[in-house]
Design a protein with these regions (language model features):
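NAD(P)+-binding Rossmann beta1-loop-alpha1 motif at the extreme N-terminus of oxidoreductases
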Residues: 1-56, 63
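Residues at the starts of beta-strands that form the adenosine-phosphate
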Residues: 5, 29-30, 110, 137, ...
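Generic beta-sheet signal
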Residues: 34, 89-90, 114, 141, ...
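Conserved short alpha-helix immediately C-terminal to the canonical SAM/SAH-binding motif I
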Residues: 39-40, 72, 94-97
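Rossmann-like NAD(P)-binding element
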Residues: 56-82, 86, 90-92
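Rossmann-like NAD(P)(H) cofactor-binding subdomain of soluble oxidoreductases
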Residues: 78-126
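Internal alpha-helical scaffold of NAD(P)-dependent oxidoreductase catalytic cores
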Residues: 132-213
Length: 215
């Protein structure tokens, strides 16, 4: 696949990794970032994660990656309703996002909810990794109104950066990830709440692996 302009809203770990993955694989001609944090924006441009940072999505964007907190996804999608490019998010919970979009934009045609099951205990564009999605699974939970061409564009992009794509409903996704991702995080945070300094000399590899989730 070859795109003209990729717009990334939120150039942190995931957004930055999307930019690096696309650039390193020659998938796009230009990467534009929308990043409110001035330090992150400067670092991303200086280090080639994106080509430029602007204040709004350019009209000629061919694909829009929405890498913002889940509660900000729906407002962004609604704001971009008149844009022609496919839009995908990267949130780890899909049901509330889909419902919020459908309430306001009942004919949403180019929004493709996505969840790349990949990440790191690090954050920010400094942690961006062009191979972050290599071998990972990306779940697509398209709306009933999502256009097939938008869905296929997003699926092809994820496959081009090394991911395997699966499709399921938002409810199926959320039920599965509650067990495989959110519960382990909850347990790790609860466990860390019981650890004191006196325990640290008595830890080993299992402690390190388990607590990494809560880092």
């Amino acid at each position: 696949m070859k795109l003209g302009t990729l717009a990334i809203i939120g150039v942190g770990l995931i957004g930055g990794s999307i930019g690096k993955a696309a650039k390193e694989r020659g998938l796009v001609e230009r990467i534009v970032g929308i990043e409110p944090n001035a330090d992150s924006a400067l670092w991303a441009v200086t280090n080639g994660v994106v080509d430029t940072v602007v204040s709004e999505v350019p009209a000629d964007a061919d694909l829009i990656a929405l890498c913002v907190p889940s509660d900000l996804v729906a407002p962004w999608v609604i704001a971009l309703a008149d844009h022609a490019a496919p839009i995908f998010d990267v949130g780890s919970v899909k049901g509330p996002i889909v419902k919020a979009v459908e309430v306001t934009w009942s004919t949403a045609s180019h929004f493709v909810p996505c969840h790349p099951i990949s990440g790191s205990e690090r954050s920010g564009p400094q942690a961006a990794d062009g191979d972050l999605f290599d071998g990972c699974t990306v779940v697509l939970t398209p709306l009933a109104t999502t256009a097939s061409v938008a869905e296929q564009t997003c699926a092809s992009f994820w496959e081009a950066v090394g991911a395997s794509v699966v499709r399921m409903s938002p409810d199926e996704h959320d039920a599965a990830l509650a067990v495989t991702s959110h519960l382990p995080h909850l347990l790790a945070f609860a466990f860390m709440g019981q650890v004191t300094d006196q325990h640290l000399p008595l830890t080993g590899g299992g402690f390190r692996d388990f607590t990494r989730i809560a880092a």
